[in-house]
């Protein structure tokens, strides 16, 4: 209200931005922040500061405030609760009016909500735990290029998880040797093989050579097995133009799927690639390289469930989501929380799984979670039980480390998977009978028996960092 007169000076954020009586709207974007204030800063002031600095506020009153309606545009901290078991930590809930965000831009959403506020001096640490994306905003995104059902129809594969394998050593192979490794894995029974996230176009293997040899491997293995095969050709590049050039070449080769590193490549590049993939019938596999830099600390950063939601909006058909049982981080309930966020249309709020809000995706296609990292045949029953049919299970070392080579390694994994799916369909309990199911299957498959022998004692047992 300009008529009241402009009063210069610094005033507390909580006078304007802490509104405990606010009723959230269906169109608001809601955020749950884990706030650790500096000593002496009350939680209401800290929560209000987060709301202010991530929306309309700045450190002092400015006369141009009178030229707009702050009540319409400001973020509001509407609820604060202490974190159980932690000293001086609070969950601050902030509501943002939808008008603050550009339609269809994950980039703009993150620039607003987490762009500036994390360096704020009044806070010791800050973590974005969850976002509620309103249906009105969801509808401005294309989302995944195809989604789970369309992918199954394209591949003609139903009723079981899909099997993949990352080609190792990740760096140093020539294109022809790389293509040979791909062929052996696909020929042995895998559905997919994968470029490692840091395989782009290096001196020892330029991207075009790799694409050609991998395409040859795909078509040769398809003709021999009668199954549709794919290799995640990594299109990630130094510029968006180069990335698109690689995706276009993949489409010209007639392969089914390409890949992108969405955090290092950036959301803008990722969304462009996702749009191209839908328009041209390519599936899009997403790797989350760099995620742990952002999500591993418990009290600072962004939780992966938020990055997973952002990916579903930006677009991708697969995304790596931890394993719960392998060598990489992932606590079971929390992991399953964001796995459901990726796959389901509607997910209820459930704090025991880290879900702070109910999320309605209104017909945005689902994303297949990918379990990858330090897993082998003995993990197959647990993975089948935990992730269910709509998932991709990726065994890199667990395929290529087989004593007889890549193709027998692929056979071992496929036999183990088929045995677990059959046992589950017959009503057996994979959690308690898993080892027995694998042992029974290995009697009929020398490849599986050899794999069981090699990896019988390997475990990666550490406490998960990410607890509720």
Curated annotation (Swiss-Prot):
What biological-process terms (Gene Ontology) are attached?
Answer: photorespiration; reductive pentose-phosphate cycle
Which species does this protein come from?
Cornus alternifolia (Pagoda dogwood)
Q: Which residues form the active site?
A: 168, 287
Positions that bind substrate: 116, 166, 170, 288, 320, 372
Question: Which residues make up the annotated site Transition state stabilizer?
Answer: 327
| Residue numbers carrying N6-carboxylysine | 194
What Gene Ontology cellular component terms go with this record? Answer: chloroplast
Amino-acid positions noted as binding Mg(2+) in the UniProt annotation, renumbered to this chain: 194, 196-197
- Cite a single Pfam family from the UniProt record: RuBisCO_large_N
Q: What is this protein called?
A: Ribulose bisphosphate carboxylase large chain
Keywords on this record? Calvin cycle, Carbon dioxide fixation, Chloroplast, Disulfide bond, Lyase, Magnesium, Metal-binding, Methylation, Monooxygenase, Oxidoreductase, Photorespiration, Photosynthesis, Plastid
What EC class does the entry list?
lyase
GO MF terms on file?
magnesium ion binding; monooxygenase activity; ribulose-bisphosphate carboxylase activity
Q: What does this protein do?
A: RuBisCO catalyzes two reactions: the carboxylation of D-ribulose 1,5-bisphosphate, the primary event in carbon dioxide fixation, as well as the oxidative fragmentation of the pentose substrate in the photorespiration process. Both reactions occur simultaneously and in competition at the same active site.
**What InterPro entries does the annotation carry?**
RuBisCO, RuBisCo_large_chain_AS, RuBisCO_lsu_C, RuBisCO_lsu_C_sf, RuBisCO_lsu_fd_N, RuBisCO_lsu_N_sf, RuBisCO_lsuI
Instruction: Give residue numbers for the modification (N6,N6,N6-trimethyllysine).
Output: 7
Q: What is its EC number?
A: 4.1.1.39
- What is its quaternary makeup? Heterohexadecamer of 8 large chains and 8 small chains; disulfide-linked. The disulfide link is formed within the large subunit homodimers.
Q: What does the sequence similarity comment in the record state about its family?
A: Belongs to the RuBisCO large chain family. Type I subfamily.
Q: How the cofactor binds, per note?
A: Binds 1 Mg(2+) ion per subunit.
Subcellular localization is given as: Plastid, Chloroplast
Give additional notes from the record. Answer: The basic functional RuBisCO is composed of a large chain homodimer in a 'head-to-tail' conformation. In form I RuBisCO this homodimer is arranged in a barrel-like tetramer with the small subunits forming a tetrameric 'cap' on each end of the 'barrel'.
> Cofactor(s) for this protein?
Mg(2+)
């Amino acid at each position: 209200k300009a008529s009241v007169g402009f009063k210069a000076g610094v005033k507390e954020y909580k006078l304007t931005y802490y509104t405990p009586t606010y009723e959230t709207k269906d169109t608001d974007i809601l955020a749950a922040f884990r706030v650790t204030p500096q000593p002496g800063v009350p939680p209401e002031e800290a929560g209000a500061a987060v709301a202010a600095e991530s929306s309309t506020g700045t450190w002092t009153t400015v006369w141009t405030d009178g030229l707009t309606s702050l009540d319409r545009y400001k973020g509001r901290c509407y609820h604060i609760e202490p974190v159980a078991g932690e000293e001086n930590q609070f969950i601050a809930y902030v509501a943002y009016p939808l008008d603050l965000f550009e339609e269809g831009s994950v980039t703009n959403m993150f620039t607003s909500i987490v762009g500036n506020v994390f360096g704020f001096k009044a806070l010791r640490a800050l973590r974005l735990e969850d976002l509620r994306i309103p249906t009105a905003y969801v509808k401005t995104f294309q989302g995944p290029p195809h989604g789970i059902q369309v992918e199954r129809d394209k591949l003609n594969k139903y009723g079981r998880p899909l099997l993949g394998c990352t080609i190792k050593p990740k760096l140093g192979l020539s294109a022809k040797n790389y293509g040979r490794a791909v062929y052996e894995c696909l020929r042995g029974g895998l559905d997919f093989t994968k470029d490692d996230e840091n395989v782009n176009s290096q001196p020892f293997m330029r991207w075009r050579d790799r694409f050609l040899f991998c395409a040859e491997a795909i078509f040769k293995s398809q003709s021999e097995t009668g199954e549709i095969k794919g290799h995640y050709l990594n299109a990630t590049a130094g510029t968006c133009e180069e990335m698109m050039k690689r995706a276009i070449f993949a489409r010209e080769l007639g392969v089914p799927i390409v890949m992108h590193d969405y955090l290092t490549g950036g959301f803008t590049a990722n969304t462009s690639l996702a749009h191209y993939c839908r328009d041209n019938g390519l599936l899009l596999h997403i790797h989350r390289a760099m995620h742990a830099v952002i999500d591993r600390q418990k009290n600072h950063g962004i939780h992966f469930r938020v990055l997973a939601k952002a990916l579903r909006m930006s677009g991708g058909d697969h995304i790596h989501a931890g394993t719960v049982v392998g060598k990489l981080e992932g606590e079971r309930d929390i992991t399953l929380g964001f796995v459901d966020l990726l796959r389901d249309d509607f997910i209820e709020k459930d704090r025991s799984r880290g879900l702070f809000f109910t999320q309605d995706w209104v017909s945005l296609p689902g994303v297949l979670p990918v379990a990858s990292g330090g897993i082998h045949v003995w993990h197959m029953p647990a993975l089948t039980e935990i992730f269910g049919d709509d998932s991709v299970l990726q065994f890199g070392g667990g395929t290529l480390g087989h004593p007889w080579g890549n193709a027998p390694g692929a056979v071992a994994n496929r036999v183990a998977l088929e045995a677990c799916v059959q046992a589950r369909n017959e009503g057996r309990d994979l959690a308690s009978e898993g080892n027995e199911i694998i042992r029974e299957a290995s009697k009929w498959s020398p490849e599986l028996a050899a794999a069981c022998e090699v990896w019988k004692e390997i475990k990666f047992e550490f406490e998960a960092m990410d607890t509720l």
